[in-house]
Amino acid sequence: MKLCGFEVGLDQPLFLIAGPCVIESMQLQLDTAGKLKEVTDKLGVNFIFKSSFDKANRTSGTAFRGPGMEEGLKVLAEVRKQIGVPVLTDVHEYTPMDEVASVVDVLQTPAFLVRQTDFIRKVCSAGKPVNIKKGQFLAPWDMKPVVEKAKATGNEQIMVCERGASFGYNNLVSDMRSLAVMRDTGCPVVFDATHSVQLPGGQGTSSGGQREHVPVLARAAVAVGISGLFAETHPDPSKALSDGPNAWPLDQMEALLETLMELDAVTKKHGFSRFA
């Protein structure tokens, strides 16, 4: 599949979707995107910047949700213009898709909305590539009908994303078998290495996280074989306005990516048919 001008798939190098969870300010987004571009250019990694203009599913009703669509799209447009990278953002049921699609390169559907048929069709009809996040409550094989709904719109640029499965209260686990199972959708598979270490609602009024396990799960996913890696990052996760506990520090992205790209090359060297 072609995405933002480059090919993605199990016969292609790992690509990266990364950025702060939520748009906090113009300068933070530009600085973060600039640093990520510097790192990915150095390592030869295809890169898409991500950040959200509205986090509609915060644990607390008083938590920071973002600047809103109008201001958020201005920021994403500036990142795209000044840094020269494609941009991704997530959308919601109330989002005017055409307006967002006129600014960003890739649309993303929140995991909690994966079963909303009309929503999936609406997003996939906007004429942009779509990254569909698998719900924490959904079996990997249940992504097949979701993809069928998506592709029924005529959009063939669909990716599926694993972000962990609910395991009791306030906890997620990553079943690495799901990455292989979701290949049966015929779509590129992306692994979300940071939301997978989230502890949803684990701090009472906010979610916790175990960012120390990001490299563990990222390495495991790359070893299984994935097309892309999704990772939220922040210059200072302790001060992030959303999902700080599971965000990977920006100054550690290069070291993590360097390891993952080496592992990706080894994993994909001989293909995957022998494991089918």
Swiss-Prot record:
SUPFAM superfamilies: Aldolase (SSF51569). The keyword Cytoplasm applies. GO terms for biological process: keto-3-deoxy-D-manno-octulosonic acid biosynthetic process. One of its GO terms (cellular component) is cytoplasm. Keywords: Cytoplasm, Lipopolysaccharide biosynthesis, Transferase. Belongs to the KdsA family. PANTHER family: PHOSPHO-2-DEHYDRO-3-DEOXYHEPTONATE ALDOLASE. This is 2-dehydro-3-deoxyphosphooctonate aldolase. It comes from Stenotrophomonas maltophilia (strain K279a). The gene is kdsA.
